[in-house]
Amino acid sequence: MLHMISHGPENGSEAGTPLIIAHGLFGSGRNWGVIAKRLANHRRVIALDMRNHGASPWSEDHSYHALAADIEEVATTLDQPVDLLGHSMGGKAAMVAALSGAPIRRLIVADIAPVGYSHSQQPIIDAMQSVPLDHITNRAEADQALSAHIEDPALRSFLLQSLNVSTQRWRLNLPALSASMDQIIGFPDI
């Protein structure tokens, strides 16, 4: 089961229709914290860590069918149809979940279309894998190492949210994401 961060009422008349949020590539449920809390005034909002991201389980299978099955597993535990918001990679997974019959009432897809793209994110994975984690003692050192490959400080800051400095490891299954890059930038046959 995916790791979930839940906000708002869980049951009762205040609960309303639950909203599940599926983040994009290299993200996590924590990225949606402020928005999720704001939306949780009258409904339960669940921000997921998608597989191979954050605190969720890692798997070699990072296909959109597998990601959609993960979303459906969470949705079915709520015992009612859900609203689903998917961003980028999470948006593609959300589309596949909706088309596969998951109990989804409304679907919101942000910043992605159901098509294949040609721009690979492999250079970002390569940059992250180049960081000498066994020599990193703080986020500033990791940022310095990443800056040799990624010029944009905002992108580096976003990526570094997935670095656990104390364990000297990424909270991302970079080998699986790398091996699945063609699937990630593509869109499956439904």
What annotation goes with each model-predicted range?
Residues 24-27, 88:
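Active-site glycine-rich loops that stabilize anionic/oxyanionic intermediates
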Residues 167-190:
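Conserved serine/cysteine hydrolase catalytic core
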Residues 127-134, 141-154, 162:
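Helix-loop "lid/cap" segments that line or gate small-molecule binding pockets
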Residues 26, 50-54, 114:
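Alpha/beta-hydrolase active-site loop signature
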Residues 15-24:
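Short beta-strand element of the alpha/beta-hydrolase
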Residues 5-11, 33-40, 46-85, 89:
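Active-site loop/oxyanion-hole signature of alpha/beta-hydrolase fold enzymes
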Residues 95-99, 103-137:
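Flexible "cap/lid" loop of the alpha/beta hydrolase fold
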